[in-house]
Each structure stands twice: as structure tokens, then as C-alpha cells.
Amino acid sequence: MSNVDINHARALVYQLLSSLFAREVNAQRLQELTSDAAQQFWTQLGHEPEFSAPVATMQKVLNDLQRNDALLELAADYCGLFLVGTRHSASPYASLYLNSEDEPLLFGQQHQQMSEFLHQSKLQVQSHFPEPADHLAVMLAYMGHLACHSEDAAQLNFLDACIDSWLAKFVVKVVECDSKHRNGFYSALASLTLAWVKQDKQLLEQTINSSVEQTLS
């Protein structure tokens, strides 16, 4: 597989993770996520030992969501976890995990920083997604963009400074708040995202180090 193909595959994973944090799963999205092509994708992703458990959980939940009431229940889980700003929710904004203030403000430093990244890449948050730019879905989507349009060093810098710096804290909060829900879909999604980011970061580090060694040899 060429570097272009690898980066395209990486971008697809980032876009998938982004989409699942961006909005609840509706009937149309469910059909896409359970199609034959999607099942092959999930199976391939689940072959990696670090991803197998969360992928299996997510596949099972998605395949069981054939009842309308089950789909509504998952949508309610999404709302309760990510849209309701209480101690029992897991707000997906970097500023809430990176700032030391007792009550960090949305649209603060991390939002401004992310907005500048988007501006430099001639991108912007779409109007139908009225969220601060430091929302995890925006950052994952941007990382997917970088995977196909930026050098490895730039990708690693963004991944390390803007996502990996707070993702583990967010995942702990998701798992804690999602524990009362039986299917555990969003706990699995959060765990998969963290595992993916860790592995991708390692891949980028290895690629950069290999390039340096080739240059010096």
C-alpha cells in the first residue's frame, strides 16, 4: 500500500470518528454504518488488537438498532452525554479539559486557536454545525484533512498538541457518564478514538524518525 493509500485510509477513519461525535445516529446514518461496505470496514479495523473490543461493541450495537425505539434511545444517550452541560455529561470541547479555570468559557483560547488552523487551511466549521471550533468532531475532521494535505511533522504536532493533550481525560469522562447506559456505544467510540490516536501518533513518529535516519545515512 502506497503512502497516499495509507493516508487516505487514515483520513477515512478520522472522518468516521468525527461524524459519530458530531451528531446522533439517525436512520440514514445507521443504514450507511451497517451496509456491506461498512461491515467490511469494521471487520478490517477490528483486526487490530487495540481496536477489536470497542469495534466489536459498536458493531453489535449498530446491528441491533433495527427498532425505532432503540435508535431513539441511542440518540438520547448522545444528547445526555454531549449536548447537556452538566456534571453527568462529557462535553467534547478541548477548552474544558485544558484550561485551569474552575469554569472555562466556550469560544475561548482553544476555540480561537482551532479557528486559526482552519482559516490557514481555508476551511471553516459548517453552518449546520453551530459548535465551537474546539469540539472534538471538528478536530478529528481537521486531522483527517491534514492526513492527506500536510507533512507528517505538521500532522504529529497538531495531533499531539490539540487532540492527544486532552483526549484521555475526555474518554474517562465519557466512560464514567456512559456507564449507566446498557449498550456502551459511546464508551466504545471514545475508547476506539483514543486507541486510534495513540497508534496513529506512533505511526507518524516512526515515519518521521525513519525519514531522518535515511537522510543521515
Swiss-Prot record:
InterPro entries from the UniProt entry: Chaperone_TorD, DMSO/NO3_reduct_chaperone, HscB_C_sf, TorD-like_sf, TorD/DmsD_chaperones
Superkingdom in the source lineage: Bacteria
Pfam (any one): Nitrate_red_del
Localization per Swiss-Prot or TrEMBL: Cytoplasm
GO biological process: protein complex oligomerization; protein folding; protein maturation
Xref: Gene3D superfamilies: 1.20.120.1820, HscB, C-terminal domain
Keywords: Chaperone, Cytoplasm
Keyword Cell inner membrane on entry: no
Ribosomal protein listed as a keyword: no
GO CC annotation: cytoplasm
HAMAP family linked to this entry: TorD
NCBIfam families: PRK04976.1
The family this protein is said to belong to: Belongs to the TorD/DmsD family. TorD subfamily.
Function summary: Involved in the biogenesis of TorA. Acts on TorA before the insertion of the molybdenum cofactor and, as a result, probably favors a conformation of the apoenzyme that is competent for acquiring the cofactor.
Protein name as catalogued: Chaperone protein TorD
Gene symbol of the encoding locus: torD
